[in-house]
Amino acid sequence: MNQTVAPSNMTASTSNADVTANSLRKINIFLHCIICVFGVVGNGLVIYITGLKMKSTVNAIWFLNLAVADFLFSFFLIFNIISEYREFDWPFGDFMCFLNSLVTVLSMFASTFLLTAISLDRCLSTWVVVWARTKRTVLKARIICLLIWLASVACSLPLVISRKTSISAQQTKCILGIQKLETYKRQVVYRFVVGFLLPFVIISASYVAIGVRVKHLRKKNKLKPFRIILAVILSFFFCWLPFYVYKFIEVWLREMNATNPSDELNSFKKVFDQIELFIISLAYLNSCLNPFLYVFMCEDFQKKLKQSLVMVFESAFAEEHLALLSQHSQSKRKSHSQSGTGIEMK
């Protein structure tokens, strides 16, 4: 009797898992469509304004390139949405499978490296004010951005070089053509260390140094010039951290399945694979958040929004930290000068 019931229970469990997976897939398609539209429109607007309407400054160059990375990420999301709608059938061929994966990973690395460069730039600007006033140029910012894009391509290729289409009787899938679990595990660790951990350490150290520096400034809202970039960095790491946690759990599940496979584990993995879509949606969400952060964290944004979007972005990307530190440096020199004059009078 038990032998008769067991297969029935397994069939019911599998059927429930399929229904759940299908429902989650539809929700994710809807979320990805929203992210794609807002990401393309929002970042397209930032690119248009910072690239064509605003005066070129170092900050404008940083955020222009960040918007380009997010725009590419959002635009290529269209191909993933179509694939998800077709129940993960990939109709675009081998080259687009590789290119779509390359752009997705490349954009992630570029965003991370740009945020790291912005943090280091802010750190140097707060500690070495004279250097920031004389050596910090738009040309150098453009060269650094070019190097960042080249480095992003180099870091991305090992992760996507094995991407290919897998054709079966029922559908064609865009897959990572890695057979060995150990190779996949190394890729997960590599992506986490290079694309998340090291940048996080550098960015954290930069803002600790900035905090130490501005603590000595006797100004109200002394961290105000840094709040937009801080918000951008925090949103990036909060959006991407669950993705890397998921990847390590996925590796653990694969190891479990390799050593002790079971129907229950397979059913759980099927639902877990759909949870991945929500986690990826959170990572994708980061690509459309930045334009909203620029606008809503801008000082008096409602008043400036009525006048011009250009003014909103100019205010958001203003290099106030340099002006703040320059004023502090000048007042310090002035007080020293007055002190020196007093001694001579005696």
Role assignments for model-derived ranges:
Residues 1-19, 168, 257-270, 299-346:
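Intrinsically disordered regulatory tails of 7TM GPCRs
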Residues 1-41, 45, 179, 188, ...:
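Extracellular N-terminal segment of 7TM GPCRs
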Residues 10-18, 84-105, 128, 134, ...:
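Loop architecture of class A 7-transmembrane GPCRs
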Residues 24-33, 58-118, 125-135:
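Extracellular TM2-ECL1-early TM3 structural module of rhodopsin-like
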Residues 64-67, 108, 142-146, 190, ...:
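Internal alpha-helical transmembrane segments of multi-pass membrane proteins, especially GPCRs
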Residues 75-78, 154-161, 197-204, 233-252, ...:
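Hydrophobic alpha-helical segments of membrane proteins
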Residues 108-146, 209-211, 294-302:
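Class A GPCR helix-loop hinge within the 7TM core
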Residues 176-181, 192-196, 208-246, 258-272, ...:
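Intracellular effector-coupling site of seven-transmembrane GPCRs
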